[in-house]
């Protein structure tokens, strides 16, 4: 009697699954375009990355349906219990993925009611979504701890060990969390510690115009050190001698007199050169007739008769 009831239940389940499988495949798979060449199909995104995500999900669902069909088609299988059903659903999950801690595990009992198929689909799809969120959360946590290393390497002596988590930067994907009430004091103490480790005021590269009030000897050292470091070494004796010569009036008057004498000499030299050039031009290009040897008496030119043969 028990075996006959099992056979009737299996037959009813098989008849229920037959119309559902073609309906899901018809909804998920796009219609075939027989007029096109096949290159512009809707199954591809156009960027060369492959099929669209919905096609991948539909194939995974179809593989799940095949597993369920093979499981229910075995004639000698015992009645499915809660453990068998849980094992069937957990085997569908990809390798290496586990549901998060604290999340309820959904166990769907195989039943002939109309809501059985909906429960199976929910169980096969929800764990995958939650595991994807867990993977991204782990990656962001790793990034946060990696960026946190340089901050915790130099903690302040007054900061408690448990408060270093408030200084960790948040990853781009995580929302910004407000630090606790003690976080502000920790940041201020670290800033004060960094301010005390800064270089002194007198060690700057440029000449400083302002001096800050500090205790006694430190102020004198800070005011004297920049002048000694920034200026190159100079011979004090040579500098004093050159400044003394320029300050004397006799030396200044001699320099001015020498300049004037040089200017006059240059003017005289230029005038002499111009005079020589003028005399040379007059001698070479003279238009006057040459003087005669008889005292300059005028003589008529002799006529030359021409005879024509």
Curated annotation (Swiss-Prot):
Alphabetical keyword list: Glycoprotein, Heparan sulfate, Membrane, Phosphoprotein, Proteoglycan, Secreted, Signal, Transmembrane, Transmembrane helix
One GO term (biological process): canonical Wnt signaling pathway
One function term, GO molecular function aspect: cargo receptor activity
Domain of life: Eukaryota
Sites carrying sugar chains: 37, 43, 45, 47, 205, 215
Topological domain ranges for the Cytoplasmic compartment: 275-309
Lipid bilayer topology: Single-pass type I membrane protein
Membrane spanning stretches: 254-274
Cell compartments where the protein resides: Membrane; Secreted; Secreted, Extracellular exosome
List of residues that carry Phosphoserine: 284
Region described as Disordered: 28-57, 142-185, 283-309
Disulfide cross-links: none
Compositionally skewed regions (Polar residues) per UniProt: 142-151
UniProt site positions, description: Cleavage of ectodomain: 249-250
Database matches in InterPro entries: Neurexin-like, Syndecan, Syndecan/Neurexin_dom, Syndecan_CS
Modification(s) after translation: Shedding is enhanced by a number of factors such as heparanase, thrombin or EGF. Also by stress and wound healing. PMA-mediated shedding is inhibited by TIMP3.
Endpoints of the signal sequence: 1-22
PROSITE patterns (alphabetical): SYNDECAN (PS00964)
Annotated GO CC locations: external side of plasma membrane; extracellular region
Acidic residues biased stretches: 32-42
Main localization, broad class: membrane
Parts of the chain on the Extracellular side: 24-253
Family recorded in the similarity comment: Belongs to the syndecan proteoglycan family.
Subunit structure: Interacts with CDCP1. Interacts (via C-terminus) with TIAM1 (via PDZ domain). Interacts with MDK.
Protein purpose: Cell surface proteoglycan that contains both heparan sulfate and chondroitin sulfate and that links the cytoskeleton to the interstitial matrix. Regulates exosome biogenesis in concert with SDCBP and PDCD6IP. Able to induce its own expression in dental mesenchymal cells and also in the neighboring dental epithelial cells via an MSX1-mediated pathway.
UniProt name for this protein: Syndecan-1
């Amino acid at each position: 009697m028990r075996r006959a009831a099992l056979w009737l239940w299996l037959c009813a389940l098989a008849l229920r699954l037959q119309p559902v499988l073609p309906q899901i495949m018809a909804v998920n798979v796009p219609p075939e375009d027989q007029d096109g060449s096949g290159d512009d199909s809707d199954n591809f995104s156009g960027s060369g990355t492959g099929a669209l995500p919905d096609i991948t999900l539909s194939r995974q669902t179809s593989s799940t349906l095949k597993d369920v069909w093979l499981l229910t088609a075995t004639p000698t299988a015992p009645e499915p219990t809660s453990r068998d059903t849980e094992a069937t659903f957990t085997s569908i999950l990809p390798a290496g993925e586990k549901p998060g801690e604290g999340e309820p595990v959904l166990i769907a009992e195989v039943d002939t009611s109309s809501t059985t198929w909906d429960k199976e689909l929910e169980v096969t799809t929800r764990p995958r979504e939650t595991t994807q969120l867990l993977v991204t959360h782990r990656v962001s946590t790793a990034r946060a701890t990696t960026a946190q290393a340089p901050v915790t390497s130099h903690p302040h002596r007054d900061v408690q060990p448990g408060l270093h988590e408030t200084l960790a930067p948040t990853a781009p994907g995580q929302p910004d969390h407000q630090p606790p009430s003690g976080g502000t004091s920790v940041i201020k103490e670290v800033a004060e510690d960094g301010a005390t480790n800064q270089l002194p005021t007198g060690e700057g590269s440029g000449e400083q115009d302002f001096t800050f009030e500090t205790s006694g000897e430190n102020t004198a050292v800070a005011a004297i050190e920049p002048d000694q470091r920034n200026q190159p070494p100079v011979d004090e004796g040579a500098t004093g001698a050159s400044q003394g010569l320029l300050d004397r009036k006799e030396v200044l008057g001699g320099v001015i007199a020498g300049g004037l004498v040089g200017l006059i000499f240059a003017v005289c030299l230029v005038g002499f050169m111009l005079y020589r050039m003028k005399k040379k031009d007059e001698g070479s290009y003279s238009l006057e007739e040459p003087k005669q040897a008889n005292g300059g008496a005028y003589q008529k030119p002799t006529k030359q008769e021409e005879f024509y043969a």
